[in-house]
Each structure stands twice: as structure tokens, then as C-alpha cells.
Amino acid sequence: MDKVRRFFANTLHLGGSSDAKEEVKVEKVIPDLSFDGFAEHWRVHGFRKIVTMVGAGISTSAGIPDFRSPGSGLYSNLKKYELPHPTAIFDLDYFEKNPAPFFALAKELYPGSFIPTPAHYFIRLLNDKGLLQRHYTQNIDTLDRLTGLPEDKIIEAHGSFHTNHCIKCRKEYDMDWMKAEIFADRLPKCQKCQGVVKPDIVFFGENLPKRFYSSPEEDFQDCDLLIIMGTSLEVQPFASLVWRPGPRCIRLLINRDAVGQASCVLFMDPNTRSLLFDKPNNTRDVAFLGDCDAGVMALAKALGWDQELQQLITSERKKLSGSQNSEELQQGKEKPQSDPDKMTSGDRDKKDASL
């Protein structure tokens, strides 16, 4: 009974004497769990097996909105699609009845219109150094792939635009085919059965990819650092990844907001469940609360990697810029001259502005 009393008094802060609090000794994985202390530990001692898990927050500086930010988030800006509720745009039942709003949004967010951020390239740098075990992402924007990160290192928990399937016969279509259909403002229809072709994005009511369930056991077995960036940790089962590493694995949060601090009442072992970076019983959690790009740049500087990271960003973006320019030129050759009688008012405004 004393053990139970001490647990609730010290871990859950639900009462108990000050003497009981003193009885619990917190053994930290590293002596200093501040961001600077963590960075110094990494610089001196290093890590061997790093897992990253990210959300929309690492892509916002690329111009892609996150989902839940009031006013600027994706769900706050869907009124023009006249949806029954904001999340309907990713609802499978609604999509089957009315796919047009999703494809209108897809045109705005389609991969190829954006370039990876410093946070994306930091993950690529981890892989280049042989430190990255696996990269788990909630994002559907494929920016991870654009950095040159190997496909086998990436688990797109919520799918992506990279592959596409007919929702009726399951015939597969590649990304280039889907892009051509979307940007021609055509509803993507299967050439075999005329069913609607949907990107392999996980909608509400669909299962996550098999690799999401089969990989964590191996990935987290000897993981000594979990880096969490740009995610609200509100969507399950993705958020449950923070529970997977053992108690000696350090968990680093780089995020605008403090997240992952679920009520300990829900979990009998809060040291493996909630992030405790601001709690007195914290043993292994570290936080950088701010912009994701600023966080990785600060970390790279502390590790002496800042020049290397900047060189990687510059060289890879130059490659992407050349590739995109080439694609635009090719599209320009194939695109007929605009018919003034068929131009929208927006097209005319753009043309007038260029004169």
C-alpha cells in the first residue's frame, strides 16, 4: 500500500507528504536534460540508433499548412468546399459520394510545388551519417523522399501521393499519371473499370500501411534516441510510437507547442507513456519549444554539423530547382497557347500583371 501511495503522491502529484516525495529517487539517463545539456551529451558521447517521427509542423515553412492551427490550419480553411464537417475531406464514405472537393484540395497541396525544409534535410543528414534507423511520418507531401532519403527508411504512416489505386478494381497508377489528371482538372478515372482513382493516402475508415505495424518492434529494440518533430501527438495510432522505446532511450521533442503530456492517470507507467520534460520525475525527455527549422539548426550548430547541413540544403535544393525548371520547360512546350476567350478572370489578372 505504501508503494501505491508513493506512486500517486510523487508521480501523479495527487497528494501525500513531502517526506514521501523525498523517498523517490529520479535516476536520469543523462545528467542534464536541458536542450543544451542534451546537445553536449550527443556531441561527446553520440547516439547509435535514431528513430524520427514527424508531423505537418516540419512542412509549414515550405508553405504547406498544418491541420489544426486556428485560422491558418487546413481544417480552418475548407469552407469553400462546403463540406458537412472539415474532416469529411479525408472521409472515405464522403469521398466515394463526392470526390471533387478532395481533388480540388489535392491540386493546391500536390507534391512538386514545394521544397523540403531544413528539418527534412536534418533527417537526411542523420541517414548520411549512418545514424537513422527509421523515419516515421504523418505527412502525405513526399518531401522526405525529395531530400534523397532512401525509400526503405521511410514509413509514411498516413500514406502519400507516391502511389495511387482505383477504389473499385485496385489497378495501380503512378504519381505522374495522377498529377497529370489533377492538374488538367479531370476527375481521375480508372482506365480499366472507370472507378475513381485515389492516392494512397490513409482516409478515416482505412487501415494504416502494414509496415507501420510490422517495423516498430525492430526499429525501437535498441533505439537510443527518438526525435519527435512538428506533431500534435493527438492522432492514434501514430502518437503511440512515443511509447515504444525502452526507458533508457532519450526522447527529444522539437515542436512549437508542448505536446505528449497525456494525463498520467490514464497510464500506469507514465515514464514510458507521457513526455515528462517539464516534470520533476523526468528521467529522459528533452524539449526545444519553437520552430522546427530553428530547432534542428540549433542542434546542428551545437554538434558542429551546421556547415555540413547548410551545404546539403544548398546542393540538394539546387538539384531540385534544376529538375523543376526542366519539367516546367517540358510542360511549356506541350502546353498550347491560352485562348483569350476561355481565360478566367484570374488568368487575365496574371497576364496583365506580367505585362
From Swiss-Prot:
Entry superkingdom: Eukaryota
Alphabetical keyword list: Metal-binding, NAD, Transferase, Zinc
Keyword field contains Zinc: yes
Disruption phenotype: Causes lethality during development. Induced silencing shortens life span.
GO biological process, one term: response to starvation
Binding, Zn(2+): 166, 169, 190, 193
Residues annotated as the enzyme's active site: 158
Entry annotated with the keyword Aminoacyl-tRNA synthetase: no
Basic and acidic residues compositional bias, start-end: 330-355
UniProt cross-references to SUPFAM superfamilies, sorted A to Z: DHS-like NAD/FAD-binding domain (SSF52467)
Listed EC numbers: 2.3.1.286
GO terms for MF: histone deacetylase activity; histone deacetylase activity, NAD-dependent; metal ion binding; NAD+ binding; NAD-dependent protein lysine deacetylase activity; protein lysine deacetylase activity
Annotated stretches, region: Disordered: 316-355
Domain Deacetylase sirtuin-type: 28-306
Gene Ontology cellular component terms for the protein in this record: cytoplasm; mitochondrion; nucleus
Name assigned to this protein: NAD-dependent protein deacetylase Sirt2
Organism, scientific name: Drosophila melanogaster (Fruit fly)
